[in-house]
């Protein structure tokens, strides 16, 4: 936002990430008259800070349900690369009960729906909401987080406009073919989704559902 001379506000549960953001914002260009704020608070409270129909764009990469809340085994990496600095570590950002990264997919989807229901009235009509997310494997099952998010946001009044695939080939080049040679399993870590929604141009009720 600073590079584009746009006003922006960001939220995070962890003070250390807010502090990091503020330190980077302190390095912005001298003649940049736009303002960017970093606030330490829950996403569920964002509507307390902003007025209705004042937001032109929401961009976020929420936790991928409880994907990171387990020890990393690095099964997709070759040989010695498996036991890197991440091996057997739990990389979940926090264990706070407010953190979406501690939730199983069903509870996660319900919380996401409620958060975005509160955000919808803040958007201008036709304003965009872009969510970066990936799917995951959990107990040998493919969890389609991007499908859950699409359904959740549609239920509270958003309209899906596009799905963009973010190719992460640079990471794929460093890993093997998972399961080779006994079997082949496609790897979800090779790409992520950019889910492009907007607030529909027709009126939206106060609870976030379209009035049509």
Residue ranges of predicted features:
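Class I S-adenosyl-L-methionine-dependent methyltransferase catalytic core
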Residues: 1-212
């Amino acid at each position: 936002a600073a590079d584009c001379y746009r006003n922006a506000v960001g939220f995070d549960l962890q003070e250390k990430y807010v502090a990091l953001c503020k330190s980077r914002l302190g390095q912005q260009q001298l003649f940049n008259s736009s303002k960017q704020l970093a606030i330490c608070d829950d996403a569920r409270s964002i509507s307390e800070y902003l007025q209705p129909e004042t937001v032109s764009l929401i961009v976020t990469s929420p936790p991928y349900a409880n994907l990171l809340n387990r020890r990393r085994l690095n099964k997709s990496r070759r040989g010695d690369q498996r036991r890197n600095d991440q091996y057997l570590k739990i990389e979940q950002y926090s264990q706070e009960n407010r953190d979406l990264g501690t939730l199983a997919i069903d509870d996660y989807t319900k919380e996401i729906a409620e958060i975005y229901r509160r955000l919808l009235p803040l958007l201008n009509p036709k304003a965009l909401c872009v969510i970066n997310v990936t799917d995951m494997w959990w107990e040998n099952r493919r969890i389609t987080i991007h499908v859950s998010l699409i359904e959740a946001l549609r239920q509270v009044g958003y309209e899906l406009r596009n799905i963009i695939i973010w190719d992460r080939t640079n990471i794929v080049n460093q890993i093997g073919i998972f399961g080779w040679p006994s079997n082949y399993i496609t790897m979800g870590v090779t790409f992520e989704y950019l889910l492009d929604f907007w607030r529909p141009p027709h009126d939206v009720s106060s609870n976030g559902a379209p009035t049509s």
